[in-house]
Amino acid sequence: MTEGHPDKICDQISDTILDALLTEDPSSRVAAEVVVNTGLVLITGEVSTQAQTNLIDLARRKIAETGYTGEDSGFGANNCTVLIALDKQSPDIAQGVDTAQEQRQASSDERFDSIGAGDQGIMFGYACNEAPELMPLPISLSHRLARQLAVVRHNGQLDYLRPDGKTQVTIAYEDGKPVAIDTILISTQHKAAIGDISDDNAVQERIKSDLWEQVVLPVFSDLVIQPDSATRFLVNPTGKFVIGGPQGDAGLTGRKIIVDTYGGYSRHGGGAFSGKDPTKVDRSAAYACRYVAKNIVAAGLAEKCEVQLSYAIGVARPVSVLVETFGTGKVADEVLLDLVRKHFELHPAGIIEHFNLQRLPGERGGRFYQEVAAYGHFGRNDLDLPWEQTDKADTLRQEALATTQA
């Protein structure tokens, strides 16, 4: 899914707001929701911050960055109406986050028991060895295609493309292993005519040919698995995609949670990421789950690993921690669970500190969360993301080996 999809526009505006507020005030509490439609942007939610930021300017700049700069698309950075309707964070929620139950009841004086989870919920993280970045192959390829689609639009290589677009890859599996590319699907917004080509069928033929040469082939150039004569290649199957973006569909923050994660390959707790500061465990704990799962797979202790955490609002310690390797583990899941509890910090305050989640926007020039708001939060080798590090893999491997030898 490209950055010009209506829901992704909303995610990016929400995270641009989050970046700006955390840059100026790292303790900001943010739940920024955005709605877009033809000619309209609504910024709503709850924010408690000392930061002074022009949210309207932020929204317009992000919209322009995605490519909506003209007035002929029904949605442009300079001609859309931007409305703001924000409240402060509820004090009933804030009191549980500011001081966790463990400290309110004087049951713990541990440092990471100071901050409670910002909500209740279940979070999952996943990793597998299907792609170099330890992601499921279908979502990995889909993101690669979407990013390349944006590249050839931004650099003018295919100057008839417009910002909205989706990609999808269907993989054939045998015995749980990817063996073939079954279908590649690209839906991309485009101008009504390409040069002197105005016939709809001829336009689609040109787009299909260009996308194969300049999007698909470059994406697969360094991969072992390749499309072949049996692979179906579908482009704009309706026959036309001129009206797109917020003019074609309304957009809403947090509506593409499967695209943001693992493409449906693993379970999902239902919580979205964008617009949420890291005290919201929907976001920070999902990042921690990915970190744990990726280190287990990187250590060679499993071919597939799913990690589940759950939290209660206002409570610092996870309610549950589970590890599942789907029969691919080199040691028992119970051994892995013990290693996870020993080596990974899973309190909300600990996750925030370990990943530096409140200060990274300021340290990276005001751009951190918005960079993952499109093209996925996981497996991003193009970005330096703390939850994608595999710095604990060696320790896990050594201790797991010692356990089996004992």
Curated annotation (Swiss-Prot):
Belongs to the AdoMet synthase family. Disulfide bonds: none annotated. Mg(2+) binds at D7. GO terms for cellular component: cytoplasm. Its cofactor is Mg(2+); K(+). Pathway: Amino-acid biosynthesis; S-adenosyl-L-methionine biosynthesis; S-adenosyl-L-methionine from L-methionine: step 1/1. This is S-adenosylmethionine synthase. PANTHER family: S-ADENOSYLMETHIONINE SYNTHETASE. It holds the Pfam family S-AdoMet_synt_C. L-methionine binds at E46, Q89, D249, K280.
